[in-house]
Amino acid sequence: MKLVPSNCLNHSEKLLWTFVDGDFLYFIDSTYALYEYDLNNHKAYFIADMEAEILRRGEVSSIIKQKTDYFIGFKSSGLIQLKYMPDSKVKYSLQSINVQSGIFCLMKDRFQDIIWVGADGQGLYMYFTDEFSIDNIMLDVPEYRVDNPVRALYQDQDQTL
């Protein structure tokens, strides 16, 4: 087997962060613009200018899309949601989510409208997109004793957390 480099994106700017979710890539380029790239039709779609938020919060650790909204985790400064506003001139509204620590990973639950958030020092969060609430599963209680931050979430062969 041989790997051959390919430049299928043909994007003019340098990519700073790239994340994969199924048939889609989410990337932020050197102008701090967030794009969604469809691997099937090979088209990139501009989503939002993230410059002010990245300059304020720092390095991006994870990006996922849940329905029409984007969730962006920052390595040392929390989680934001780009909420789709179909009737607005600006299509996405930035909303801060109440997680005050670094975000290491985001994962969509395949059975429910839940986003699992692995946080630095605050354990594992469940963000319920329908109820607009967030809950923390503290990993320092005896049933879940974990002394380290949640840096990654894994699925088994049945695709369960």
Regions found by a protein language model. Give the residues of each.
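Carboxylate-rich, polar loop motifs that coordinate divalent cations or form catalytic acidic clusters
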Residues: 1-161
